[in-house]
Amino acid sequence: MTVLPEKEYIYEDEITKEPEENRRLKRLKRIMGYGKRRRAKETTTVSDMFIYGAKKLLAEGKISKEEIGAIVVVTMSPDYFCPTVSAIIQGELGLDFDVQCLDISQACAGYIVGLVQSFMLLEHMEGKKVLLFTGDTFCRVSSEKEEPPSYSAPFGGDAANITIVENAGNEKIYYEFHQDGSQRNCLVIPDGAFRNPMTVEQIQHQVTRMPITSVVMDGSTVFNFAQKEVPVLINSLTDMAEISKEDIDWFLFHQPNKFMLQKLAERIK
């Protein structure tokens, strides 16, 4: 199930810059395929969307409280540092105290990371299911004021997804992850946690490099990493599963950049 905020923003309606900036943003639309996005109210958190969707699943009989053995939450925009979002959901749904609650801080790879963690939990919970929650209120950490601009604001949107994960026979699961922590500054929210904490004065006067908790992205480095590593991952995974790329009907990539997807498609042919 996917939960979307009601408010929809059309990309063209957000282009209100001076003429030169207007031309740049229109070029971005053509190259990257920007169209529209959803944005949650300032008072709406990711747990609000998760809980709304979970209650709907329960009301529709898609799953019962007794079947839930674990809650896995993947988000970069939690309600608080503490408690965890999964604990908030457990409490709001009135689930048993022995339901396992796990929060994972992941961005683009988050759904797959959460899915694999859910598979692992199922190995130790006979007869139970896992509720996997993935989502963000990303608009709050997107900024058009970054120097250099990262373009995170045009494609940053808010949404939540809930997946019911359960065992189904003895089918094999194939997966592989590549991480490069040495490039951690290429996609980072630099301020607000304990490395660069905010003082009371900074919070009151917004004396920061940019709006508090904004994302900084080195787009070219992210692009190059994806173009280099993703084809390697695909080849490794198909070899592991002993299938060919021609056997696969659809390749689904977590990426809002049309240009990057087109270039990636050329490399994996």
Positions of the model-derived regions?
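Internal helical hairpin/lid segments
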Residues: D218-V222, A226-N235, A241, D249-Q255, ...
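Flexible, glycine-rich active-site loops centered on histidine and acidic residues
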Residues: E123-A159
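Glycine-rich phosphate-binding loops at beta-strand->alpha-helix junctions
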Residues: V74-F81, I248-L264
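Phosphate/pyrophosphate-binding loops at sites that engage ATP/ADP/AMP, CoA/4′-phosphopantetheine
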Residues: G53-G69, V232-D249
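Short acidic, glycine/serine/threonine-rich loops at helix termini
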Residues: E8-Y9, C82-T84, V116, V141-E146
